[in-house]
């Protein structure tokens, strides 16, 4: 006779299986996981060796053990040895400098002032925590004794927060962490504000470039009206107009070694003017496109020009020969500067890079790629071995000879066309929107912002600064602007540190984004 099997739902069968499984292991539910003594010892040994290895086992001589004991309450911590049961390992107990109280924050009472032997559980835990020593470790451990302390512990003073912690082991010294002084931001030097002193008009187009002659008697400007004009610096009156370029004049410079004026323009021409006869005596041919800037070497008769053809050229002033063609930029070279020290030539380009060149070899020494936008201006500090570059993203300061980055000067959010700096550390940046910012060179503090009004007869949109320069006495600042004028600024003689205080707060961390 076939026995009928009672049918159950899947849900019931699953729960019955779960119950059987639970009943099978129910005895182990409340049982703790057994402790593996060997692995626990190894774990504690590794932790102690990593964290307390240099100070846990310090070698000492038997004579020092006999002579030196804990002298006073200021001695260092000591290792005490307590005998264990026969046939077991020696157990160590680490005691503090005082027999009482047993821990921080414990009140001193009749009960806590008594120094007790460690309990069995405490001694067992300490014994487990001690590392397993190899033979090499055993050779350098201290000999058995009632107690010992580190050599020289009582001789050294208690370290303060600003002192270094030194542990002496025989004749060697292991220096531990030394507290460092918190970094401080230098306070910017106070500079008097600059105010508009004079506006000079006479050009019929944008004034694109400006230069002051070494004698500080006159200055020269070049304009989009294709003329070069020479002005009296003291009175601001026009002295002379020179014609010869057939397009915008983009750069002018006066030689300190001879009575020559050099100019360049968008007509690809580079001209040398003899100021005794007021005429062109030399042409320098070679550029394939507009010439954007030029500079003279301070110690040798060498002229350097930069162009929209992505090259800079080095010319012999006397022979008109092209000594080197500095190629490497991938876009128009907007600015060039020369100095007597290495590197002698610095160029900034619309390809966002700055290159430092070897004048003798005509090759690139360093390429700086930190800027993200076109570099239209570069200026060298007259005293420090540093320079600055201007770009629409920010102004950056660099250190020669390798172009090490110093700091960012952020805040002039415009296309920066020109930079100039004087020996007092006043950096001036002029932008295409007509704003001019003045900075402290050392700290990068922006102490003044100027936006001169557009002159009558010019459109409001014609607001832009294309060039600026200090005169030789550094008491006047001249700017060449898009409203066809030259503006002259002077320091405010009535300003003091009380009337115009430095509104500066130190930053916690100076941002040095590349």
UniProtKB/Swiss-Prot annotation:
Region of interest (Disordered), residue spans: 135-160
One Pfam assignment: WD40
Stretches forming WD repeats: 202-241, 244-283, 286-325, 328-367, 370-410, 411-449, 460-499
A single GO BP: protein localization to nucleus
Chief site of localization: nucleus
Phosphoserine modified-residue sites: 119, 201, 391
Gene3D superfamilies according to UniProt: YVTN repeat-like/Quinoprotein amine dehydrogenase
Family, as annotated: Belongs to the WD repeat PRL1/PRL2 family.
Localization in the cell: Nucleus; Nucleus speckle
GO CC annotation terms, alphabetical: catalytic step 2 spliceosome; fibrillar center; nuclear membrane; nuclear speck; nucleoplasm; nucleus; Prp19 complex; spliceosomal complex
Keyword set includes Nucleus: yes
InterPro entries hit by this protein: G-protein_beta_WD-40_rep (IPR020472), Prp46/PLRG1-like (IPR045241), WD40/YVTN_repeat-like_dom_sf (IPR015943), WD40_repeat_CS (IPR019775), WD40_repeat_dom_sf (IPR036322), WD40_rpt (IPR001680)
N-acetylmethionine carried by residues: 1
SMART domains given in the database record: WD40
Keyword rRNA-binding: no
Residues annotated as signal peptide: none
Chain's role: Involved in pre-mRNA splicing as component of the spliceosome. Component of the PRP19-CDC5L complex that forms an integral part of the spliceosome and is required for activating pre-mRNA splicing. As a component of the minor spliceosome, involved in the splicing of U12-type introns in pre-mRNAs.
Keywords, ordered alphabetically: Acetylation, mRNA processing, mRNA splicing, Nucleus, Phosphoprotein, Repeat, Spliceosome, WD repeat
Complex formation: Identified in the spliceosome C complex. Component of the PRP19-CDC5L splicing complex composed of a core complex comprising a homotetramer of PRPF19, CDC5L, PLRG1 and BCAS2, and at least three less stably associated proteins CTNNBL1, CWC15 and HSPA8. Interacts (via its WD40 repeat domain) directly with CDC5L (via its C-terminal); the interaction is required for mRNA splicing but not for spliceosome assembly. Component of the minor spliceosome, which splices U12-type introns. Within this complex, interacts with CRIPT. Also interacts directly in the complex with BCAS2 and PRPF19.
UniProt-recorded name of the protein: Pleiotropic regulator 1
């Amino acid at each position: 006779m076939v026995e009928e099997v009672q049918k159950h739902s899947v849900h019931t069968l699953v729960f019955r299986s779960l119950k059987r499984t639970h009943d099978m292991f129910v005895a182990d539910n409340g049982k703790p996981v057994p402790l593996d003594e060997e692995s626990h010892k190894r774990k504690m040994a590794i932790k102690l060796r990593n964290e307390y290895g240099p100070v846990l086992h310090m070698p000492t001589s038997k004579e020092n053990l006999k002579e030196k004991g804990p002298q006073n309450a200021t001695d260092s911590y000591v290792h005490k040895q307590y005998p264990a049961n026969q046939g077991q390992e020696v157990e160590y107990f680490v005691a503090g400098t005082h027999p009482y109280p047993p821990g921080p924050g414990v009140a001193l009472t009749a009960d806590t002032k008594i120094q007790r032997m460690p309990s069995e559980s405490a001694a067992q835990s300490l014994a487990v925590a001690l590392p397993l020593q190899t033979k090499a470790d055993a050779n350098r451990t201290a000999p058995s004794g009632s107690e010992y302390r580190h050599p020289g512990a009582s001789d050294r003073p208690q370290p303060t927060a600003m002192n270094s912690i030194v542990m002496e082991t025989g004749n060697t010294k292991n220096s531990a962490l030394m507290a460092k002084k918190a970094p401080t931001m230098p306070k910017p030097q106070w500079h008097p504000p600059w105010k508009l002193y004079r506006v000079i008009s006479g050009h019929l187009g944008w004034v694109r470039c400006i230069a002051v002659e070494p004698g500080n008697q006159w200055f020269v400007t070049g304009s989009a009206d294709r003329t070069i004009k020479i002005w009296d610096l003291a009175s601001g009156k026009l002295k002379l107009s020179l014609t010869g370029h057939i397009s915008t004049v983009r750069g002018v410079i006066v030689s300190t070694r001879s009575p020559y004026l050099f100019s360049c323009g968008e007509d690809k021409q580079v001209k040398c003017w003899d100021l005794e006869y007021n005429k062109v005596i030399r042409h320098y041919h070679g550029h394939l496109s507009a010439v954007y800037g030029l500079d003279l070497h301070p110690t040798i008769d060498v002229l350097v020009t930069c162009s929209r053809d992505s090259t800079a050229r080095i010319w012999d002033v006397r022979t008109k020969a092209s000594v080197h063609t500095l190629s490497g930029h991938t876009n128009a070279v907007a600015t060039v500067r020369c100095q007597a020290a290495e590197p002698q030539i610095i160029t900034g380009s619309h390809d966002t890079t700055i290159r430092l060149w070897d004048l003798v070899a005509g090759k690139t020494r360093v390429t700086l790629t930190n800027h993200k936008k076109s570099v239209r201006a570069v200026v060298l500090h007259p005293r420090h071995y540093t320079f600055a570059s201007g770009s629409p993203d920010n102004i950056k300061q660099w250190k020669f000879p390798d172009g090490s980055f110093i700091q960012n000067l952020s805040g002039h959010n415009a296309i920066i066309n020109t930079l100039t700096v004087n020996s007092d550390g006043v950096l001036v940046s002029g932008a295409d929107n007509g704003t001019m910012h003045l900075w402290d060179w050392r700290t990068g503090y922006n102490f003044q912002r100027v936006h001169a009004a557009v002159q009558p007869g010019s459109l409001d949109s014609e607001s832009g600064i294309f060039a600026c320069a200090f005169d030789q006495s550094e008491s006047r600042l001249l700017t060449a602007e898009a409203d066809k004028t030259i503006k002259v600024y002077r320091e405010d003689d009535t300003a003091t540190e009380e009337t115009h205080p430095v509104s500066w707060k130190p930053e916690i961390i100076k941002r040095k984004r590349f």
